[in-house]
Structures are given as C-alpha cells and as structure tokens.
Amino acid sequence: MKLFVHLVLFISLFIPYFTKAALYVDIKKSSVGNIGLVVSKCTCKTALESELSENIAKVIGTNLSNCGLFNVKRSAEAESKSWKSDTVVTVSLSEISGSALELSFRLFDAFTKRELLTQSVVFPAKDWRKIGHLVSDVIHDRLIGEKGHFNTKITYIAEEKDSNYKSVRKIAVMNQDGSNIKYLTNGDRFVSTPRFSPNGKGIVYISYANGKSYIILKNLKDNTESIISAFEGVVSAPRFSPDGKSLLISHSLGGETNILSLDLSSKRTKKITKGSAISTSPSFSPDQKYMAFSSDISGSQQLYVIDFTNKSKKPKRISFGSGRYATPVWSPKGDLIAFTKIQSGKFYIGVMKPDGKEERLLSEGHKIESPAWLPNGREIIFTRTESPSNSKLYLVDLVKKNQKMVSTPTNASLPDWSYF
C-alpha cells in the first residue's frame, strides 16, 4: 500500500505543478526546432539497479524521441562538458528491497546551468515501464507546457492468416510504445471498430453473428465483456459521447443507413438522421454540442455537422473540395476535424476546421483511412493498406507532416487511442 501511495502522489501532485511551471514552446509553428535532450543514467550499485535504470532511461529516450519535439541523445556520463545547450535528464535507482526501488531523476539546463526539476518516487520493480512513461510525461509537461501521452494505450484490429489461410481478426490493445500487447478476443468471430471509453476502463466494439450486429463492451480491468445491445441489420462506427453516457452508431436496415444515439443506461435508441441518404461515421465535438458525420445527402459522400443546440438540427455541409469525404473525427481540443478524402483513385488523411475552412491534407497513399486523434490533438493515427495482405498503423503530426509506422506483430487496422 505504501508503494501505491507514493506512486499516486507522484502522478497527482507533481505533474500538474510542473505543467504550470513549463517553458512553453510554441508547437503550432512549423519553424520550431526540436529541443536537444540528453538522457543519462548514474552509476548503480547492484545488477538490478543497473538493469532497470537502463530500461527506464531507454523508455524515456524512446518516448521523447518519438513524439517529434526532441532530439534525444543517450549518454553513460552523469555530467559532460559536451552537452553545452542541451537539456539533461539523469536517472538513478536505489534498491530498497527485492521488489521495490526508489527512482530519482533530475532535469538540468546545461546552457543556463539551472536545475529545472528534481524528484524521486518509490515503485515496485515490476512497474519500471510505467515509471518510465510517467517520468516522460513530467518532462514533456515541464518543457512543452502540454500534458504528455506516454501512459496511454492503442487499440486496433489485429489480422493474420491461420493454418488454413483463413483471415482471423482479433481486438488488440497495447501501450502507446507498442509494448504489452494483449488480445481481447480469440478470433472465433468477426469483430470491428474498437473504441475506448472516455475513462479508459473499457473498449466497445462490433461483432456480427447469426444475422445480427452486437455492440459489446469489454472491461479492461477484469477482462469481462457484456452485450450492450443487439440489432437486426448492420451496425458500424460506434463512438462514445464525451460524457460516456451514450454511443453514436450507424445502423443499416431496410435500405436505409442512419445515425442513432444509444443510451447506455436505458439501452434506448434515438434516430438522429432520417431518410434514404447513407449517413455514417458520427463523431461528437468535445463539448457534445455538435456531431460531425459523412453522408451522401447531396449526391456524393461529404462531411456534415449537426448543431444540437439548434432546434431544427438540420445538417450543415462543411466539405466542398473535389472528391469524396469520409470518417470525420473531432479533435480532443475541438479545433479541427480529421477525415479521409478519396479523389482520383488516391486516398488522403486531412484536417479542416469545424466550419469546413482551412482544409489541409497531411498524408497520401494507395489506401489510407480510419483516422483517430492522439489525446494531445497534434497527431493522428491511421491505417495504411499497401495490398490486401499488408495493412499497418501510421502516425502523422499536424505541424511537420512527419510520418512513422507503429510497429505491430500482425496486420493492423481501425486504430483508436485512449484518452489521458
């Protein structure tokens, strides 16, 4: 219990404090250069201290390098004249018992010779990776002035061929750095579109069996699952409301495809769109006052927004570029909507303002789709399919449009990223 209290205090007290004291870097400007960062570890007394301090330093370095805002270097030295203008992170461990250690870390500005922060935390040895992520969050907060996302998770559809060359799909979840992959389903049924609940404690997904569509909620703590609702016809594109009390879904039945709201307490549904148009891919704004979706109301697939504060709730078209638009997703900051664009046989991932202005295309490919936001609102994860047997997850940032593949052991698609 003592270890747990130490860890909770570390998370709840120090991260907010360092955020307030941040050296705010304007990450919205494309001209911003990366921050030089040296990750160093101190001399250790025991083999366990040496092993875990190296592991933690590696996690910190990888996290901060991958976020695209730091130029990270590793050093075996605790101090060096060569660091000059770098910011330096030093990590040291002291073994308290066979199962507990105390981590001390120090953030130092080598240019001004000023100590930016120093802190320690006691933790169980088995939680070394989590500690690495938490320290990464603190450093990110202190230097960028923005909450880090290193202790979050990714869910996606993992797909591979069995011994009979039959495609097997499973719901997978892993840490944001690709570690600790778990499969939440066993591949005995078709599954699709996993989505995190706002509190991060569950994942909702769609399964199809016996001519019905099932909306299923998986509890990530005890690995149990429950059927939220079953529908005749095809249900797709589930999306939680920001308050976690309802789901938006697309429902196809009798030649119509409309968007429904499903109350998770009463299990009652309410039709939001009506008519013969195909309306799908709903997404709430963070304040839950608006909903973005795609529809062919105008004859071709475009993006629309409904204002729930307006009595008429009439859809307003926001996409007017050439081509078709699909899979809109509202950013966690509320300032942008990500989407998939299909034009002249090519696919694009792009963003626009909620009123449709300032459309920007971030990535182009043979088939790229299914964008989902990272909780920082600066990066997007999406699916890139190069061939029917090769689909992977990629990240793209809004400022520099840098892309990198997210490593997974199998084909991967339909990603979602957990909230803070």
From Swiss-Prot:
Signal peptide residue numbers: 1-21
GO CC term, one of those recorded: periplasmic space
Key words, A-Z: Cell cycle, Cell division, Periplasm, Signal
The keyword Cytoplasm appears for this protein: no
Record carries keyword Cell cycle: yes
Coarse class of the protein's main subcellular location: periplasm
A biological process term (GO) from this entry: cell division
SUPFAM superfamilies: TolB, N-terminal domain (SSF52964), Tricorn protease N-terminal domain (SSF69304)
Disulfide bonds: none
Pfam families, sorted: PD40, TolB_N
Superkingdom of the source species: Bacteria
UniProt family annotation: Belongs to the TolB family.
Subunit composition and interactions: The Tol-Pal system is composed of five core proteins: the inner membrane proteins TolA, TolQ and TolR, the periplasmic protein TolB and the outer membrane protein Pal. They form a network linking the inner and outer membranes and the peptidoglycan layer.
Function recorded in the entry: Part of the Tol-Pal system, which plays a role in outer membrane invagination during cell division and is important for maintaining outer membrane integrity.
Official protein name in the record: Tol-Pal system protein TolB
